[in-house]
Amino acid sequence: MAPTQRKVLHRGRAAAGVRALLRAACLLGIAASGAAPISATAAELRLPDGIVTHADGRLPLQQLAASWLRLVDAGWQLDLIAESKPPGTTTALPIVALRSPTPGAAVWILTGIHGEEPAGPNAVAAAIDDLAALGDTLPVVLLPLLNPHGYARNWRYLDLPTFSDTADGHSVGDSSHLLPDPAEPGRPRAGAASSPEADAVTRYVVRTSAAYPPLISIDLHEDDLVTAGYVYSQGELGTSDPLAQAAVAVLREHGIAIQLDGQTRFGETIVGGIIGPVTDSSIDELIGATSILVDGRAQAGPSAHTVLVFETPAKELPLDRRVAAHLTLLRRLAGLLAARPEL
């Protein structure tokens, strides 16, 4: 996590088959924040022909999308948030979300904000059946790949390939245009969204929170500049959140090094492997915010009780181990939430 910027289809099927299978009963329009979803009959989401995914062992985009279809088959709603076409790209790729059939206080799961962090999207694909089962017990909103072009070309941001101390990359999760300025709460931190993608994603979060208010949010990240990970807890309980503590235990049990104290490389204090709420203008801060500014007007924010961001070390671990750690984390948390939804 950096200040301000944290830091379709079954296997082997042809592209034509991919496009024919990836269908949504409802296409979510990108209108004003408070607008209702716009329906379209049998709207089709397409992955363009010829999309090549960075070859480091991560699943191709087509295989990720194949896993999402299993949720659609289980009755989940597939929403098109935006068609992403960042600078330097020639084709648009869909940013999608999936919602379990029954609305209500929900578990939100996000991944793929940073394109050079593939473990989360791959773990979500492997955990689809577990997430489907969780959706039978609790409302769930899944944003499985928020930066598809970044994933395909191994770029962290929409406009920069790597984190930089001297340049602010445009993250798809930038929320500064909706979050109050701490020094002047009546004004947002930025006058406009940093990109069309950030605008669309944050509008989706605000709008969807009406029917699926986030109770618990889980955001999967990696950091290739550290050898020990940690968990951000942006919610009400901070470092005392029992889910954050359980997550630290799961990661340690799985052999993932966790920094238990000291500070992150951004100067944030770590207590038991957990960092309490920070002001970073991320989508996670937005999901936990009790008050936001939309079109210049203050309104209640999504107000999630628990907002967890997992930063696992990528520097010295092969991808398969990183995916396995994220998969174990998802399965354990899904099982815990299904058994004890009061958490």
Annotate the PLM regions:
Residues M1, V8, G17, L21-L22, ...:
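C-terminal accessory segments enriched in acidic
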Residues L22-G34:
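Bacterial N-terminal signal peptides
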Residues D79-I81, V96, V141-L143:
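General small-molecule cofactor/ligand-binding pocket signal
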Residues I95-P103:
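Short beta-strand-to-loop junctions in surface cap/lid or active-site-entrance loops
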Residues G104, P118-A127, A132-A249:
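Active-site/substrate-binding loop(s) of hydrolase catalytic cores
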Residues A106-T111:
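Short beta-strand element of the alpha/beta-hydrolase
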